[in-house]
Amino acid sequence: MGRTLRVAILGATGYTGGELIRLLHRHPGAELSFVSSERFAGQSIAKVYTHLQAVGHLICQPMDAKKACEAADFIFCALPHVTSMEVVPELLQRGAKVVDLSADFRLKSAETYAHWYGTQHLAPELLPQAAYGLPELFRESIKGANLVANPGCYPTSVQLPLFPLLQEGMIDPALVIADSKSGVSGAGRSPAQGTLFAELSEGFKAYKVEAHRHIPEMEQNLALAAGKEIKIRFTPHLLPQSRGILSTCYLRPTSGVNAQRVRDTLMTRYRDEPFVTVLPHGDMPATSDVRGSNACHMGVTEDLRSGWLIIVSVIDNLVKGASGAAVQNFNLMTGWDETTALDSLPMFP
């Protein structure tokens, strides 16, 4: 068991920040001591999020790295991309451990970051140091890290089923298709026309086709599993619901591989993982099965006519896809049991 640490959340009034507060409130090793928000500075967090009345004593402060480090030992950085890399170097220099929920430290190549995010990386020297924070795949490197790059939500839903199969040479790395659907909270809390109720309700659309910024993150990590470069065909879609990601992956199996072998491989790989469930033959997951939880459920089948494998995985984009994974990383970095504060059952209906 780890010790109790003072914890800060920078960018506490976005959806991931609010979800971090909800999860950390029940963590015996986390004392929330500092929350920041430029927009809501001076206001109670309960004024910003009325469901957080139990922590109404928390007052949003302007973003100040020095004050955050004076108030806390461990910092969750839930700031936007680019803003985060302006702040994280100072946090580390002041001795804080950091989980960063932006994309600023997920990619190992500063050139790749510049290509996909349209700006030069301001702290390229930190990229090799940042541990990629998907515990089921990179647990040991997370434990010893001072900086963890929390994964993107889509990559979490795709990498968990695909990584073991690429490691075992069970699927063709040249033929990987991921078709993903996300609830609108994945777009963040800032007002935008595309996320208005009238724009989303009773509709369903693809967006950023072949141009989503999570593509290089998936290709980088899946290439580690495959031992060679991989190009993924990835199409994200926006669902008219608040939470949840469902990813359908279409895969060409290698010789002698069928759905049962794939299911057995995934079951063996994740048998001792508390948050991953591989469903039995004939069952497929739904986003409602994991709502509000840190769980990932996946189902496996095959198209006998084409010979292709189909894997469906679901997560809650705000929990396993963001804040839940961040708390899981906090637990690993500070010596707490990995499931601490994350063992709640999903909400249904």
From Swiss-Prot:
SMART domains for the chain: Semialdhyde_dh
EC number(s) from the headed UniProt entry: 1.2.1.38
Catalysed reactions, as listed in the record: N-acetyl-L-glutamate 5-semialdehyde + phosphate + NADP(+) = N-acetyl-L-glutamyl 5-phosphate + NADPH + H(+)
GO biological process, one term: L-arginine biosynthetic process
MF-aspect GO terms: N-acetyl-gamma-glutamyl-phosphate reductase activity; NAD binding; NADP+ binding
Function field: Catalyzes the NADPH-dependent reduction of N-acetyl-5-glutamyl phosphate to yield N-acetyl-L-glutamate 5-semialdehyde.
Family: Belongs to the NAGSA dehydrogenase family. Type 1 subfamily.
Entry-linked PANTHER family: N-ACETYL-GAMMA-GLUTAMYL-PHOSPHATE REDUCTASE, CHLOROPLASTIC-RELATED, N-ACETYL-GAMMA-GLUTAMYL-PHOSPHATE REDUCTASE, CHLOROPLASTIC-RELATED-RELATED
Protein name as catalogued: N-acetyl-gamma-glutamyl-phosphate reductase
Gene responsible for this protein: argC
